[in-house]
Amino acid sequence: MKEDQPIIVERTYNAPIEKVWNAITDKDEMKKWYFDLAEFKPEPGFEFQFYGEGKQGEKFLHLCKVIEVIPKKKLTYSWRYDGYEGNSFVTFELFSEGNKTRLKLSHKGFESFPVTPNKDFAKENFMEGWTYIIGTGLREFVEKANN
């Protein structure tokens, strides 16, 4: 199977790198803008799961495993769905730009997922989802004065 180009979403936040790193690695912070994670530890080998909703309200159990952690720089985890073939990888990379932080999210391997009737695993859906999550959810969270 030909591997598609990864999805890449980049945004610069008016927030220090420590705040952005905590937002993507602390489960209590993540619940405020990302998904409702029961547990999360930024440690290689740590497995976590959460439910996400499909286009028609279907619940998909996401199964993830932390692959790589470079504190305040990089976080990679696998991303797959319970009961479906395929595996993908999500990477968050952080770059300090003065008192701002540039985040680069890449998601690769999503083409290994099956085609569903509602195209829940289509590249366009992932792009739309990540654009909202990174461009709106995370931005609003880290740029708030007190959270």
Residue ranges and their predicted role:
Residues I8-N14, K41, Q49, K65, ...:
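Generic structural detector for well-ordered beta-strands
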